């Protein structure tokens, strides 16, 4: 039994760490590193021109054909960009390029880039010199202005700056362009407290000819690293594209997949998205039409995922509209679920999602009462421990009985010496006589590992944990303990637990078991502090429970002997 238990513990330790590394392989970013820019002493503003693009909007624009299953890239010549149009709400701070009307800059005022600089918001979109990430949209096809050989349309706006005023619930920003008797309005509608904005094209055809075009919307990103990633050494979250299909509500498309060639799907409704740590950006088309979804690389090597809608036809003297929604913000499951089916799955809890989702649901409800994620994790641990109390109690009783028969095991070892077969047979007979389950001590470990891994992914993926403080030196539960105090405490609790367990009769096994607290402490040094907190509390409760059961059985044994 002892060798089996030792092997199991070592194997689970290895599986845990390999599982984390496997997560890194499957979900981790395969991006090229970029130079990190230190935060300035003043909160930076959005620049007035789209730097890095030389003031141009020379992106690869998809062309629409009669068959919407194909959308080949079309090179458009560079057009000098005018000053950007700035828009600010209570949750968004963005800039729109008049050339094409793309959202080229976007910051999240409620999410600081660094915890020690709350005045510097996290920047989601950037079309500057360091990296490229923006949301593009336009009208292509037969008469679409974005398909012109002369370049994308240059829109005008009544103002250069828009801000949602106090008491104002919504705000509309309109961009206008006219050509060949056709008037175009590109309208952005913002609402207080929302990270999604509605983009509407109004085509007013005052020409003598019918107008036909296709709406396209896409997300363009280079291969730079994830600026929102705060994970530890050996771990990472998924950085890449994803889309919805009827057969697969959450289909990831990595940069490597896009490198292999274009991916094309005909999808009714759905969404296309770009995922990174804690945040997601998604274009959501009209759910009532079938759109051509595709991924590709443009001429500059940027990765693109987007869709092209069916042809919109507008007769002379008539108006036509087409709409899409852009979401750019945190991975809030409740909000994403309301926006579009399957979008909440971008909060990726891995293969143990069926355990992780209930854990997060319970954790949220506890936090609603306590208001602190650290204390919420402690209460959650106590509830989980209470749930498995009967199973743990049976296991600890088995280990207590084994500790009581340890002297008898020593006698058997002296009797049978190096004859392992006879020793094993004698041990099993003794266990049967004493009514001991030789594998009983392994059950708590087996039960805890899925919960442990699920909580790890909850802490890693849930934006609610980002920069969430507990007490004293733990100012962010989503990253490692800066002073490694919790991992050391965790190692100490493991050592105390070992003292309560029966010593393996094999000296080699005993040495391996003594090394386990050191090995686990090393693993936990870089784990999120919230996860280590869970393990510390769990171990502490286990020690109390095991000590109580051991004393109780010891007292009963002495009473029976008397």
Swiss-Prot record:
The cellular location(s) given in this protein's UniProt record come to: Cell inner membrane
Question: Mainly localized where?
Answer: membrane
Q: How does it sit in the membrane?
A: Multi-pass membrane protein
Query: Can you supply a Gene Ontology BP term from the record?
Result: protein insertion into membrane
Gene Ontology MF: a single term: membrane insertase activity
> GO CC terms for this protein?
plasma membrane
Q: Which HAMAP family does the entry link to?
A: YidC_type1
Function noted in UniProt: Required for the insertion and/or proper folding and/or complex formation of integral membrane proteins into the membrane. Involved in integration of membrane proteins that insert both dependently and independently of the Sec translocase complex, as well as at least some lipoproteins. Aids folding of multispanning membrane proteins.
The record's subunit annotation is: Interacts with the Sec translocase complex via SecD. Specifically interacts with transmembrane segments of nascent integral membrane proteins during membrane integration.
Q: Which family does it belong to?
A: Belongs to the OXA1/ALB3/YidC family. Type 1 subfamily.
What NCBIfam families does UniProt report for this protein, alphabetically?
PRK01318.1-3, PRK01318.1-4, yidC_nterm, yidC_oxa1_cterm
The protein here is known as Membrane protein insertase YidC
Species name: Pseudomonas syringae pv. tomato (strain ATCC BAA-871 / DC3000)
């Amino acid at each position: 039994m002892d060798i089996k238990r030792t092997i199991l513990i070592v194997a689970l330790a290895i599986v845990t760490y390999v599982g984390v590394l496997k997560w890194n392989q499957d979900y981790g970013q395969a991006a090229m590193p970029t130079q990190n820019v230190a935060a300035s002493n003043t909160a930076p503003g959005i620049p007035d021109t789209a730097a890095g693009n030389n003031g141009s909007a020379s992106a690869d624009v998809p062309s629409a054909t009669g068959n919407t299953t194909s959308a080949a890239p079309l090179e458009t010549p560079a057009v000098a960009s005018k000053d950007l149009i700035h828009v600010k709400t209570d949750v968004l701070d963005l800039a729109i390029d008049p050339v094409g009307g793309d959202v080229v800059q976007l910051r999240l005022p409620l999410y600081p880039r660094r915890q020690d600089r709350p005045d510097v918001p996290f920047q989601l979109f950037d079309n500057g010199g360091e990296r490229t990430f923006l949301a593009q949209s336009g009208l292509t096809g037969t008469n679409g202005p974005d398909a012109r050989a002369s370049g994308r349309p240059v829109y005008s706006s009544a103002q250069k700056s828009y801000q949602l005023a106090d008491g104002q619930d919504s705000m509309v920003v309109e961009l206008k362009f006219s050509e060949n008797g056709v008037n175009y309005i590109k309208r952005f509608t913002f609402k207080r407290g929302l990270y999604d904005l509605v983009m509407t094209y109004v085509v007013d055809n005052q020409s003598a000819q019918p107008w036909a075009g296709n709406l396209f919307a896409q997300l363009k990103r280079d291969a730079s690293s994830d600026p929102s990633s705060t994970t530890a050494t050996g771990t990472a979250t998924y950085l890449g594209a994803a889309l919805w299909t009827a057969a697969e509500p959450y289909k990831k498309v990595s940069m490597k997949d896009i490198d292999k060639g274009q991916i094309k799907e005909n999808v009714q409704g759905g969404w296309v998205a770009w995922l990174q740590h804690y945040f997601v950006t998604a274009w959501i088309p009209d759910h009532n039409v079938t759109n051509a979804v595709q991924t590709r690389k443009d001429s500059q090597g940027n990765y693109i995922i987007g869709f092209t809608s069916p042809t919109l036809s507008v007769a002379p003297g008539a108006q036509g509209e087409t709409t899409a929604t852009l979401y750019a913000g945190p991975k809030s499951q409740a909000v994403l679920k309301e926006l579009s089916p399957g979008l909440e799955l971008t909060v990726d809890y891995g293969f143990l999602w069926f355990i992780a989702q209930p854990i997060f649901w319970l954790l949220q409800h506890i936090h609603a009462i306590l208001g602190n994620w650290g204390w919420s994790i402690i209460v959650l641990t106590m509830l989980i421990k209470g749930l498995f109390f009967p199973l743990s109690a049976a296991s600890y009783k088995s280990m207590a009985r084994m500790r009581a028969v340890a002297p008898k095991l020593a006698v058997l070892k002296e009797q049978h010496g190096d004859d392992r077969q006879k020793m094993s047979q004698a041990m099993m007979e003794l266990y049967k006589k004493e009514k001991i389950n030789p594998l009983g001590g392994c059950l708590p470990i087996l039960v805890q590992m899925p919960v442990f891994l699920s909580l790890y992914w909850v802490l890693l993926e849930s934006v609610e944990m980002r920069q969430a403080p507990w007490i004293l030196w733990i100012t962010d539960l989503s990253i490692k303990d800066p002073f490694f105090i919790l991992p050391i405490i965790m190692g100490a609790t493991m050592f105390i637990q070992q003292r309560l367990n029966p010593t393996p009769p094999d000296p080699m096994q005993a040495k391996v078991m003594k090394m386990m607290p050191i090995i686990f402490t090393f693993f936990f040094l870089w784990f999120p502090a919230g996860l280590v907190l869970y393990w510390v509390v769990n171990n502490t409760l286990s020690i109390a429970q095991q000590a109580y059961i051991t004393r109780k059985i010891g007292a009963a044994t002495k009473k029976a002997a008397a």
